[in-house]
Amino acid sequence: MSEIALEELPGVGPATAEKLKEAGFNTIEAVAVASPSELATTAEIGESTAAKIINAARQAADIGGFETGDLVLERRKLVGKLTTGCTEFDEMMGGGIETQAITELYGEFGSGKTQVAHQLAVNVQMDREHGGLGGSVIIIDTENTFRPERITQMVNGLSEKYGMELNPEEFLQNIHVARAYNSNHQILLVDSAVDLANELKEMGKPVRLLIVDSLMAHFRAEYVGRGTLADRQQKLNKHMHGLLRFGDLFNACVVVTNQVMAKPDAFFGDPTRPIGGHIVGHTATFRLYLRKSKGEKRIIRLVDSPSLPEGEAVVAVTTAGLTDQ
């Protein structure tokens, strides 16, 4: 992350810098990845001025140009891996859940999506030695499924697993939850999450995990019928790219849970499909399909990844949290 102040950019004086900060653009990286219309609207400046500021920020932050594959490889060394707490699951994911990427968990009710999200919210706060990223968590809760009691159980489970004393209250203090009441509010909360992440970063508690549980609940309820599909997908596309940008800006994992639908015309194979269409499919970096099995067992299938082969892992959802079966 660049240490260059906003005021050092050509065309940005103290007054403009203040407007940008008020609009949530606290770093030159945040400015560099914005669109001119977005910057002009939120910071109340002209669109041509916004375009010049963005170009200057891209040059200063070294964003937007071509680079060779070896440099991309070098930069990817900054990508962190968050443990799931299960050996088989971690191996399937190439070491864990990646930062700077969106991981989608989809499956029918009771398949364990929220349980995985809760477990990751605990694991991310552990140090790197124990597979964590030593960071805070932001949760956008659309279905009122966050349960602090479950976090307490999982922290106690980790205490037993590693033979160390962990305080559940400290873990809960590092989890920041917001309830989203409609799709507009949900999108707005991503902007609020950027502001909160900047504040926490200054306090030495960087946000390393953003969870949206669930991604499509409000969109599915508000946009009914084929006539509203185009509007829904356009809005959803903006939301998904906002989440992706959050992951890039803060080197954080972004995990979204998703609902499913049955495809009645599927005569062979599993008729279960995630909702959200191609927008979610193309924007999510990793897609995981969760299925119920006997008792506590859950089967997690890696359906899509840019670098990993398809695979399956069997885990158990116990009182102590997510464990190897």
Curated annotation (Swiss-Prot):
UniProt keyword list: ATP-binding, DNA damage, DNA recombination, DNA-binding, Nucleotide-binding
Family label: Belongs to the eukaryotic RecA-like protein family.
Any one Pfam family match given in the protein's UniProt record, by short name: HHH_5
Residues at which ATP binds: 107-114
Protein name per the record: DNA repair and recombination protein RadA
GO molecular function: ATP binding; ATP hydrolysis activity; ATP-dependent DNA damage sensor activity; damaged DNA binding
Lineage of the species this protein comes from: Archaea, Methanobacteriati, Methanobacteriota, Stenosarchaea group, Methanomicrobia
GO biological process: DNA recombination; DNA repair
Source organism of this protein record: Methanosarcina mazei (strain ATCC BAA-159 / DSM 3647 / Goe1 / Go1 / JCM 11833 / OCM 88)
Keyword Cell membrane: no
Annotated function: Involved in DNA repair and in homologous recombination. Binds and assemble on single-stranded DNA to form a nucleoprotein filament. Hydrolyzes ATP in a ssDNA-dependent manner and promotes DNA strand exchange between homologous DNA molecules.
NCBIfam families in UniProt: PRK04301.1, recomb_radA
